[in-house]
Amino acid sequence: MNIAVFAYSKKGCETARRVMELLPDDSVSAYAASRLKEDGFGTIPHNSKDFYGEWFSWADAMIFVGACGIAVREIAPHVRDKRTDPAVIDIDELARFVIPILSGHIGGANDLAYRIAAALGSTPVITTATDINAKFAVDSWAVKCGYKIGNMTAAKMVSARILETDIPITSDFPIAGNLPNGLVLGESGDIGIYVGYKDRKPFKMTLSIFPQIILLSL
């Protein structure tokens, strides 16, 4: 992953260094407020909108070490689409809490927050409803399986309904292992999930999920 870490105080830089040590297999760049002049850190420019915008469009994850409000203000002008926005995480300077702010599922912010929190001995603050209710998260599942979501509006409706009741799923391909919590096999109902490539709408509101297939021709 390409990860950028931003710190705004001496203690924040100490925590940022700890975070960087936890990510040896990732490409991590660190930046600090200009007044700090920390070794190994780039400088956050005073006119920072374009600076954060470039990282937002390029990075897989942005980690802010400081007040949560800083992260929100800096990313706000650049938020576009949950399918493409990077994971954004905030960590307080004492590393007590690790908070995914943006792209918790598709961008992987929740998983990264759990990973960092476990290594730092911090508390992960997860607020996505499917996670705190231990329910199936269709967008997270699709990313992990390498699938594409056909319609994000339908995905939101599935996520909302699954908090209330189980959702039927039907697939043109075998589903390995046990079904996630909140899913049942079925081919009828008001709302459900279809996995495959056919133009099928087995449910009144069908969320189509497309597996990726690589075709080679000689």
Predicted regions mapped to residue ranges:
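Extreme N-terminal starter segment of soluble prokaryotic enzymes
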Residues: 1-5
